[in-house]
């Protein structure tokens, strides 16, 4: 019995030893903490000594003004803050160029093709950032695309810079075609069939009427004033007929946040109708493009244009239904795979349609494919749109920079510029009047009709995307006369962006708060804010 008791006592002592070891370590830490809490002389701190120590610390580290802190941060070693960010960004830019140079050699040196593309890309980004910094009170910010466009324009027309930054036409055309594919995918995914059903008549009228009338007006003016053939006149008309979502949508969102026109759904109407307006313009342009470069009788050209539309729609239906189900929803990285497929198929459609002699079918195929894919994806459509938006952030500076770089001042005749401005001005006035008529009998008052008419003015994105397509196609055919027609179309597109984008943005910002009714909820919030300020 005694042996059993000893064994039991021994077993009980084992865990107690562990507990004692833990307790001793805890006590050790407590002692260390206590030693740390003691003063230098080893005495325990009292309330008076704590106050004394705090005063000594405050006297030892006086508070510095903000400007001294900023200077200390700037002159710190190693650098921090803004200086550190600048050094990091410059290093990344130089590293990108150095990596490309190590692979391509002379192509990435001044005068080389890749050097020109990289420099144009950087300059366009800087130009867009600078324009984005221009902010006027109570007005929407100026669209950064203007800075990108002007950056490309300056690169081409400043002698010293243009000698060292040169881009081959083939590369420029290919990059613009890829950017066009990205725009078409975004337009197709952004189509909202439910919004069209809700707004019905007024949305359809606003999408079709101004675009078609402006296209016809521009075609007549281009034929009689500029001497363009009818097919080229209608191409120019559909280039001008599209409204710019890059200008209209941000401005509408600002008004919507302020509660202007929300009760009658004016911001929603303009954003929804803008997508259909752009698709109509792009489809009409592609159809006229195919007819303009067809050889044969007029009847044959018309039939070929209809055939291109049919080919584009049918191919888009097939591809759209395919990527609705592949990749399947149980796969990993589903969003990235879907974004890659829709972008890859769109780029392939645009390039292959030109290769097979049906240039008008590629854009329509892309629109139908993206629209059907978006309807099938429903739950992940928004995530795919975010990935496509990243691709657009990359190709937007290239697109607008390359468009600006295509315009050479010395190659333009003064009378050509005058005729282009006259054609643009008359077409825009007709568009404003037609837009006013299209929104009649839709429940809007006179002020709201005037606002919608001027809000339907800005042009930018679609003009940059398709404005140079005719010129690129003419260059591929090697006909100087057709290249001249293409240059006229591009010049009008360039002028339309430079003139209407900033003017339209400013008009929306100025007229919106003055002509649109404000929602009651926003009025109550403002009244409460004013009352609290008075109190």
From Swiss-Prot:
Biological-process GO terms, alphabetical: clathrin-dependent endocytosis; flagellated sperm motility; lithium ion transport; positive regulation of osteoclast development; regulation of insulin secretion involved in cellular response to glucose stimulus; sodium ion homeostasis; sodium ion transport
Keywords carried by this UniProt record: Cell membrane, Cell projection, Cilium, Cytoplasmic vesicle, Endosome, Flagellum, Lysosome, Membrane, Metal-binding, Mitochondrion, Sodium, Synapse, Transmembrane, Transmembrane helix
TM stretches of this protein: 86-103, 113-132, 144-160, 171-188, 200-226, 233-241, 270-289, 300-323, 339-356, 361-372, 390-410, 417-439, 461-472, 486-508
Regulation: Allosterically inhibited by the N-terminal domain. Inhibited by phloretin.
Membrane topology classification: Multi-pass membrane protein
Region ranges (Disordered): 1-70
UniProt GO molecular function: identical protein binding; lithium:proton antiporter activity; metal ion binding; sodium:proton antiporter activity
Location within or outside the cell: Cell membrane; Mitochondrion membrane; Endosome membrane; Recycling endosome membrane
A Pfam family reported for this protein in Swiss-Prot or TrEMBL: Na_H_Exchanger
GO cellular component, as recorded: apical plasma membrane; basolateral plasma membrane; endosome membrane; lysosomal membrane; mitochondrial membrane; plasma membrane; recycling endosome; recycling endosome membrane
Binding, Na(+): 243, 274, 277-278
InterPro entries linked: Cation/H_exchanger_TM (IPR006153), CPA1_transporter (IPR051843), Na+/solute_symporter_sf (IPR038770)
Catalysed transformations (reactions): Li(+)(out) + H(+)(in) = Li(+)(in) + H(+)(out); Li(+)(in) + Na(+)(out) = Li(+)(out) + Na(+)(in); Na(+)(in) + H(+)(out) = Na(+)(out) + H(+)(in)
UniProt effect for mutating residue 214 to R: Shifts the specificity from Na(+) to Li(+)
Biased composition range(s): Polar residues: 16-34, 46-58
Extracellular compartment residues: 104-112, 161-170, 227-232, 290-299, 357-360, 411-416, 473-485
Result of altering residue 431 to E: Shifts the specificity from Na(+) to Li(+)
Cytoplasmic side: 1-85, 133-143, 189-199, 242-269, 324-338, 373-389, 440-460, 509-535
Biased composition (Basic and acidic residues): 1-14
More about this protein: The subcellular localization of SLC9B2 remains controversial. Was initially thought to partially localize to mitochondria. However SLC9B2 does not seem to contain a mitochondrial targeting sequence. It was later established that its localizes predominantly in plasma membrane or intracellularly to endosomes and lysosomes. In another recent study, endogenous SLC9B2 in the distal tubular cell line mpkDCT4 is detected in recycling endosomes but absent in plasma membrane.
Subunit text: Homodimer; dimerization is essential for SLC9B2 activity. Lipids seem to play a role in the stabilization of the dimerization subdomain.
Family named by the database record: Belongs to the monovalent cation:proton antiporter 1 (CPA1) transporter (TC 2.A.36) family.
Function description: Electroneutral Na(+) Li(+)/H(+) antiporter that extrudes Na(+) or Li(+) in exchange for external protons across the membrane. Uses the proton gradient/membrane potential to extrude sodium. Contributes to the regulation of intracellular pH and sodium homeostasis. Also able to mediate Na(+)/Li(+) antiporter activity in kidney. May play a physiological role in renal tubular function and blood pressure homeostasis. Plays an important role for insulin secretion and clathrin-mediated endocytosis in beta-cells. Involved in sperm motility and fertility.
Protein name (Swiss-Prot/TrEMBL): Sodium/hydrogen exchanger 9B2
Source organism of the structure: Bison bison bison
């Amino acid at each position: 019995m005694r042996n059993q008791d000893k064994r039991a006592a021994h077993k009980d002592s084992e865990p107690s030893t562990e507990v004692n070891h833990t307790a001793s370590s805890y006590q050790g830490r407590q002692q260390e903490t206590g030693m740390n809490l003691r003063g230098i002389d080893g005495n325990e701190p009292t309330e008076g000594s704590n106050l004394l120590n705090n005063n000594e610390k405050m006297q030892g580290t006086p508070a510095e003004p903000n400007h001294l802190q900023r200077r200390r941060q700037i002159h710190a070693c190693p650098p921090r803050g803004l200086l550190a960010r600048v050094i990091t960004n410059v290093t990344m830019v130089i590293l990108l160029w150095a990596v490309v140079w190590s692979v391509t050699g002379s192509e990435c040196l001044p005068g080389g093709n890749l050097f020109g593309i990289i420099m144009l890309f950087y300059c366009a980004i800087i130009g867009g950032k600078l324009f984005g910094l221009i902010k006027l009170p109570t007005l929407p910010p100026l669209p950064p695309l203007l800075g990108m466009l002007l950056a490309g324009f300056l690169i081409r027309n400043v002698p010293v810079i243009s000698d060292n930054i040169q881009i081959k036409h083939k590369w420029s055309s290919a990059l613009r075609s890829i950017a066009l594919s990205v725009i078409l995918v975004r337009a197709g995914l952004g189509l909202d069939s439910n919004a069209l059903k809700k707004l019905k008549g007024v949305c359809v009228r606003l999408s079709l009427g101004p675009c078609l009338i402006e296209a016809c007006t521009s075609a007549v003016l281009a034929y009689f004033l500029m001497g363009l053939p009818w097919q080229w006149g209608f191409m120019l008309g559909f280039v001008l007929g599209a409204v710019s979502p890059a200008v209209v949508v941000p401005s509408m969102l600002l008004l919507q946040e302020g509660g202007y026109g929300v009760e009658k759904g004016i911001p929603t109407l303009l954003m929804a109708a803008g997508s259909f307006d752009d698709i109509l313009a792009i489809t009409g342009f592609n159809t006229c493009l195919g007819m303009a470069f067809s050889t044969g009788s007029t009847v044959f050209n018309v039939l070929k244009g209809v055939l291109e539309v049919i080919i584009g729609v049918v191919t888009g239906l097939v591809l759209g239904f395919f990527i609705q189900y592949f990749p399947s929803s149980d796969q990993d990285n589903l969003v990235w795979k879907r974004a890659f497929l829709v972008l890859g198929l769109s780029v392939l459609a645009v390039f292959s349609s030109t290769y097979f002699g049906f240039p008008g079918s590629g854009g329509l195929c892309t629109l139908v494919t993206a629209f059907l894919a978006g309807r099938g994806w429903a739950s992940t459509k928004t995530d795919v749109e975010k990935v496509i938006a990243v691709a657009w952030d990359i190709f937007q500076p290239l697109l607008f920079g390359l468009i600006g770089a295509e315009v050479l001042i010395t190659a333009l005749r003064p009378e050509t510029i005058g005729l282009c401005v006259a054609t643009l001005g008359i077409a825009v006035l007709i568009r404003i009047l037609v837009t006013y008529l299209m929104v009649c009998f839709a429940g809007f008052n006179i002020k709201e009709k005037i606002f919608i008419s001027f809000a339907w003015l800005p042009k930018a994105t679609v003009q940059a995307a398709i404005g140079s397509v005719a010129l690129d196609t003419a260059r591929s055919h090697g006909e100087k006369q057709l290249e001249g027609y293409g240059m006229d179309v591009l010049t009008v597109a360039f002028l339309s962006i430079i003139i209407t984008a900033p003017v339209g943005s400013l008009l929306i910002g100025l007229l919106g708060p003055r002509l649109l009714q404000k929602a009651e909820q926003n009025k109550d919030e403002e009244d409460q804010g004013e009352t609290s300020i008075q109190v």
